[in-house]
């Protein structure tokens, strides 16, 4: 069904994806571009991997932060398209607080890519979801790191954020915008009832889950004891047989 949709909605992207088997066989890249246009964020999460690049809780004043310019984005889009790449993910920070977000999407050119945006869901209501769909965004990847409001809000250091994600999931579905969850997994979490409860929740909501391994960078730079090992990796593979999750 997704292929049929892509073929009619974004034929250029479909054509590039259909060429992936040949590219793989010939050793060419089919890389997904995960693109951090700006590090602006309205959260101060416990595990933030880019916390050294912005001023927590003062993002409006962080004028000296690193960022791309729109002309850089146009050049990147052109080069990626010429390489036959087909997937583009706008990440951050929190992409939906970028003031020139619409211009950013236009600079990427949605007709050339299957376009995904990350979001913590705080600003994503139905009207916003409809707008994202209208300007060419194909999928939203919502961050959710707990099966309960208490777990998620504590991890994200943002009271009320779990409820905002719940709203965002429904908003995307109502706007016919593809949606998946993104969650961080670390050594201790995979052994908890909370982890299975989280996966059961995603299954009930009929949304897939992208599982991100915690890494010893940013705010987790010195939290090496919580990194996944081969043992936990094998346990995660067992969960993959039961739930719609991928890494």
Locate each region found by the language model.
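C-terminal accessory regions of radical SAM enzymes
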Residues: 1-24, 200-204, 234-247
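Radical SAM enzyme [4Fe-4S]-AdoMet core and its adjacent flexible, acidic
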Residues: 135, 143-145, 150, 154-247
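Conserved alpha-helical substructure of the radical SAM core
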Residues: 2-139
């Amino acid at each position: 069904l997704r292929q049929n949709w892509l073929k009619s909605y974004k034929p250029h992207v479909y054509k590039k994806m259909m060429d992936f088997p040949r590219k793989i066989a010939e050793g060419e890249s089919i890389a997904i571009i995960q693109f951090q246009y700006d590090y602006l964020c309205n959260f101060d999460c416990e595990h933030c991997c880019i916390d050294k690049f912005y001023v927590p809780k003062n993002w409006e004043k962080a004028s000296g932060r690193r960022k791309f310019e729109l002309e850089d984005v146009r050049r990147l889009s052109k080069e990626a398209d010429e390489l036959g790449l087909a997937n583009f993910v706008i990440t951050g920070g929190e992409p939906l607080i970028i003031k020139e977000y619409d211009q950013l999407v236009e600079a990427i050119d949605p007709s050339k890519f299957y376009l995904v945006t990350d979001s913590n869901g705080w600003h994503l209501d139905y009207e916003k979801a409809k707008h994202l769909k209208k300007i060419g965004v194909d999928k939203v990847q919502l961050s959710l790191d707990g099966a309960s409001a208490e777990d998620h809000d504590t991890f994200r250091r943002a009271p009320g954020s779990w409820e905002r994600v719940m709203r965002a999931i429904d908003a995307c579905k109502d706007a016919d915008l593809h949606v998946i969850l993104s969650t961080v997994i670390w050594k201790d979490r995979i052994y908890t009832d909370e982890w299975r409860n989280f996966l059961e929740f995603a299954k009930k909501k009929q949304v897939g889950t992208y599982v991100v391994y915690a890494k010893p960078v940013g705010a987790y730079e010195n939290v090496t004891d919580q990194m996944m090992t081969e043992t936990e990796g094998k346990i995660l593979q067992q969960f993959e047989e039961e739930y719609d999750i991928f890494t």
